[in-house]
């Protein structure tokens, strides 16, 4: 049975699934309120070093740069509607291939063109991040985000990070005003 996390909680993926080499991260959401304009939310990953910054712009993985330089992190593609149950976007991580310089994988979701469309995370519900074993589909951990991000246009859902020889998953749930530009700047990406 999957470990259910609350904001700030963490779990050792290495202990929960010792034989897992390839993890799949699923991120999901639903539009709660709409004025008729579609919602396009985009998942992205910042592969950061000890200083919390990406090693290079190529370590920002998203729908236009689907694979990290070491080949370990692969975005599975953009879902432009977010409709239906289950994962809206997925990222595959080969934990055995992640460069030793990468200390953390930060998983974020942003609302495309949020300012022009007057959209924010207060209009989004049922957001979640889950980690499961890609080999057998077993869900290891899940974080259902609370719905207290009323005006933010970007959100860090969670992180996979190294802790000694282990990989851990931390539930973050931190909103950001300023959308993708603010998140990218914080993590050292030039956009």
UniProtKB/Swiss-Prot annotation:
One Pfam family per UniProt: TerD
Gene3D superfamilies, A to Z: sav2460 like domains
Signal peptide interval: none
Superkingdom field: Bacteria
GO BP of this protein: response to tellurium ion
Record keywords, A-Z: Plasmid, Tellurium resistance
Function summary: Not known; seems to contribute to the tellurium resistance (Ter) mechanism. Also involved in phage inhibition (Phi) and colicin resistance (PacB).
Family stated for the protein in its record: Belongs to the CAPAB/TerDEXZ family.
Descriptive protein name: Tellurium resistance protein TerE
Species of the source: Serratia marcescens
Lineage of source species: Bacteria, Pseudomonadati, Pseudomonadota, Gammaproteobacteria, Enterobacterales
Gene encoding the protein: terE
């Amino acid at each position: 049975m999957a470990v259910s996390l609350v904001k700030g909680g963490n779990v050792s993926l290495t202990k929960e699934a010792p034989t897992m080499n390839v993890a799949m991260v699923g991120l999901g959401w639903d539009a709660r309120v709409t004025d008729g304009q579609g919602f396009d939310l985009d998942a992205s990953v910042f592969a950061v070093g000890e200083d919390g910054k990406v090693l290079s712009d190529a370590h920002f993985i998203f729908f236009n740069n689907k694979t990290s330089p070491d080949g370990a992190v692969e975005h599975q593609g953009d879902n432009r509607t977010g409709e239906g149950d289950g994962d809206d976007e997925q990222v595959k991580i080969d934990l055995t291939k992640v460069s030793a310089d990468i200390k953390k994988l930060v998983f974020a979701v942003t609302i495309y063109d949020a300012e022009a469309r007057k959209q924010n995370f207060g209009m989004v519900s049922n957001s979640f991040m889950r980690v499961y074993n890609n080999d057998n589909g077993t869900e290891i951990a899940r974080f259902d985000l609370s719905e207290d991000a009323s005006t933010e246009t970007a959100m860090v859902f969670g992180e996979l990070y190294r802790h000694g020889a282990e990989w851990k998953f931390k539930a973050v749930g931190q909103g950001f005003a300023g959308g993708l530009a603010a998140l990218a700047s914080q993590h050292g990406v030039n956009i």
